[in-house]
Amino acid sequence: MFFLGFLSVTMDYWSTKVKIYSYTLLTLLVITLICYLIHIFCKLRMKKNSVTNNMPPPPPPYTVSSRCSQYYID
């Protein structure tokens, strides 16, 4: 009789432990899914912004004219 009571307590302990692990795993899975969706949303938004705000390329760097070369000492 004592053994059956101990077994039921042990089963309750393990089922509680399994429930805790299951809920923890489910919570982590949901958090991961939310973060992944936010990541995709931000990536698409930045891609959209880069297309709409397409800036012209910067001007080429200025070159030194040949007249200034006389000031250089060889």
From Swiss-Prot:
Statement: the UniProt record of this protein carries the keyword Electron transport: no
Protein name: Uncharacterized membrane protein KP93L
The keyword Signal appears for this protein: no
Transmembrane segments: 20-40
Entry keywords, A to Z: Host membrane, Membrane, Transmembrane, Transmembrane helix
Membrane topology: Single-pass membrane protein
Gene Ontology annotations for the cellular component aspect, listed alphabetically: host cell membrane; membrane
Note: Encoded wby inverted terminal repeats (ITR).
Protein family membership: Belongs to the asfivirus KP93L family.
Organism of this sequence: African swine fever virus (isolate Tick/South Africa/Pretoriuskop Pr4/1996)
Chief place where the protein resides: host cell
Subcellular location per the Swiss-Prot or TrEMBL entry: Host membrane
Coiled coil: none
